[in-house]
Amino acid sequence: MDFILTYLNTLIASLAALAGIISIYYLIREMQEQNKVARANARQNVSDSHQEIALKGMTPRMVKIKMKLRNNEDLSPEEDAAYLTYFSIMLRSRENQHYQYSIGMIDAGEWENYQKSFKTLFKSEYHLKLWSFMKDTFNEDFIKIVDGIIDENN
């Protein structure tokens, strides 16, 4: 009788251990799925933010300012202030994208695509002037990335 009780006790302990392992496996799988969902949400938020900024850049006032910049015309003090704010918001969005990338919420390929827009953005002397004015307000790692892209362009 002791043999049967020992055997049953061992069998039950083994089944409990197996159930624990299976539970851990399913917990890991669930965490992986939640991570995928979180990454997709981060990407969507970045996309929404980018779209919102792009739409702000399409207002008649901002289009006029952009056309002046493209034609190397001087901006009025009011236009300069408005564009400084717009440019700052645009860079803050990129800084947030870098943060999302640094914590693994945006993959490397996507981050590389985001960086491509910097290459055209910082060909403008006006944008370089704005960047030098405001760069100290950004995260050090982000500053290094932007400065590296600027150096690469020049």
Predicted regions: what they are:
Residues 78-154:
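An amphipathic alpha-helical interaction surface
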Residues 2-75:
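Membrane-proximal alpha-helical anchors
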